[in-house]
Amino acid sequence: MPQPAIAELPRWVAWLAQDADGVWWGYEVEPLQYDRGWYENEVGRRVRVGQDRPNSQWAQTLRAVP
């Protein structure tokens, strides 16, 4: 699954991850995992940054943004 271009993310995004439904999110702090995706646990900001096909391998998509 292609991920959003790093250069197009808001500067504050430090983590990138995709949920099972295919939605890509940018997070200010490392998100926590739940059964179908990721959440920010009320700490930091998050922003929707893209949509792709549902991904059964979503749990492997969490990446730190350089």
Predicted regions and their residues:
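Assembly/interface hotspot detector across virion components, adhesins/toxins, and nucleic-acid enzymes
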Residues: A14-Q18, R36-E40, R46
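Amphipathic alpha-helical oligomerization segments
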Residues: P4-W24
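Low-complexity intrinsically disordered segments
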Residues: N41-P66
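Short, surface-exposed terminal/edge motifs of secreted or surface/virion proteins that either
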Residues: G22-G37
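Extracellular/surface-exposed low-complexity repeats and stalk/linker segments enriched in Gly/Pro
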Residues: M1-I6, Y34
